[in-house]
Amino acid sequence: MTMLLDGGPQFPTLGVGGFGTARHHEMSNRDAGMGLNPFTEPSHAAAFKLSPASHDLSSSQSSAFTPQASGYANSLGHHAGQVPSYGGAAFNSTRDFLFRNRNSGIADSTSAGGQHGLFASHGPPGIGEPPGHLIFPGLHEQSSSHTSSNGHVVNGQMHLGLRGDIFGRPDPYRAVPSPRTDHYAAAQFHNYNHMNMSMNVAAHHGPGAFFRYMRQPIKQELSCKWLEESPMNRPQKTCDRTFSSMHELVTHMTMEHVGGPEQTNHICYWEECPRGGKSFKAKYKLVNHIRVHTGEKPFPCPFPGCGKIFARSENLKIHKRTHTGEKPFKCEFEGCDRRFANSSDRKKHMHVHTSDKPYICKVCDKSYTHPSSLRKHMKVHESQGSDSSPAASSGYESATPPAMVSANSEEPSKNSSATHQTNNSSHNTGLLPPNFNEWYV
């Protein structure tokens, strides 16, 4: 909760003293006897119809407030524009007792050359307060704030150190400047600690530096490349409608092109689709296929820190087994206790038991039971091709083995002869025991 004490209208008869900004005008004996704040405009008292009038006040009432008035009068003569503390004055009224106690903690902490009251202006005499009181009066430079043990004053506002710190409005009699100034650059967000507003705006940033976090993300345009029906002998045209989000594109595809349950022809008409107009047996298969073109992946991994997303729910189900450790597919070969997370891995493993080697090298015709073993083998050919000639660098594309090329060459080099010996040893695998290190077990 925040206490906001504003320098507004004065109510001397109600026991509330004046706390407005110091103003330079003469103070008559009538005002001093009445106990009015010397910094209050005379029109304020008339506007509130304060009674009794000054000529009806008794001498006892006038003497009760005389010490307070004299205190203000002395301050005007010595420190114009500043309000001193109530030191040395007796407790002549309830008002003096309340507000002198509150003021004592602040007045004692200030220097003797520049004493300040509760709501006095803080600055050299004759210099107005800095402008910039447009929206947030608390967003000002730190040099204009005054701290103390009980609280601090910011630009004519008393700020008590309570929970939920918020600054109130500025002096109601101050003119509001039109342009924004650089006070937003030195925003004192550290005063909002109790509101969990953990903003750390540096004082050296330019005006509106914190608005960089409010930038809108760059819009990406997703276009529909679905081929629309056209009359005979006319080329088909694409839809070419653009959308700002994937959700809008998918909704458009579902409603306009894929169709509802009444649609019986499940064909993908996306531009340059490799299926070539081949129909799907079910609508959900067409929907899954369209995600290949649109790039939609609506199934994210729920495990924290993973961040992977998938286009099909089946792939997500298989992926989650890597987190859970589940392996429901057991090897069907008797005596083998290997288990796998998906059926495709189990199928690849079964080639070990059946002696099937469907993965054949196109360079040396060597076969393997698992594609990973073939990939390891192809690295040998790639290294040999880089040493001998660039023609044999790609084993998948070369039709002639490097051994035959090196054997038929008229001027073989040392590298080609070494390649010839290596490949001859690989062709004589029938005479040597099989290399079990390359098997996928």
Swiss-Prot record:
Gene Ontology biological process terms from the UniProt entry: determination of left/right symmetry; embryonic axis specification; nervous system development; neural crest cell fate commitment; positive regulation of DNA-templated transcription; positive regulation of transcription by RNA polymerase II
Q: Which GO terms describe its cellular component?
A: cytoplasm; nucleus
Query: Where is it localised?
Result: Nucleus; Cytoplasm
State the Gene Ontology terms under molecular function: DNA-binding transcription factor activity; RNA polymerase II transcription regulatory region sequence-specific DNA binding; sequence-specific DNA binding; zinc ion binding
A Pfam family annotated for this UniProt entry: zf-C2H2
ZnF (C2H2-type) ranges: 222-257, 266-293, 299-323, 329-353, 359-381
Q: What is its main location?
A: nucleus
Q: Does the keyword Metal-binding apply?
A: yes
Q: Which residues are the signal sequence here?
A: none
Region Disordered, residue ranges? 375-441
Name the source's superkingdom.
Eukaryota
Bias category Polar residues: which stretches? 406-429
Q: Which keywords, in A-to-Z order, does the entry hold? A: Activator, Cytoplasm, Developmental protein, Differentiation, DNA-binding, Metal-binding, Neurogenesis, Nucleus, Repeat, Transcription, Transcription regulation, Zinc, Zinc-finger
Bilayer-crossing residues are: none
Task: Specify residue ranges for compositional bias: Low complexity.
Answer: 383-399
What biological function has been recorded for the protein in this entry?
Probably acts as a transcriptional activator. May bind to the minimal GLI-consensus sequence 5'-GGGTGGTC-3'. Can determine the ectodermal cell fate and promote the earliest step of neural and neural crest development. Involved in establishing left-right asymmetry in the embryo.
Q: What PANTHER family does the entry give?
A: GLIS FAMILY ZINC FINGER 2, TRANSCRIPTIONAL ACTIVATOR CUBITUS INTERRUPTUS
Name the family.
Belongs to the GLI C2H2-type zinc-finger protein family.
What does the entry's free-text domain comment contain? The C2H2-type 3, 4 and 5 zinc finger domains are necessary for transcription activation. The zinc fingers and the N-terminus are independently important for establishing the L/R axis.
Q: What is this protein called?
A: Zinc finger protein ZIC 3
Q: Which gene encodes it?
A: zic3
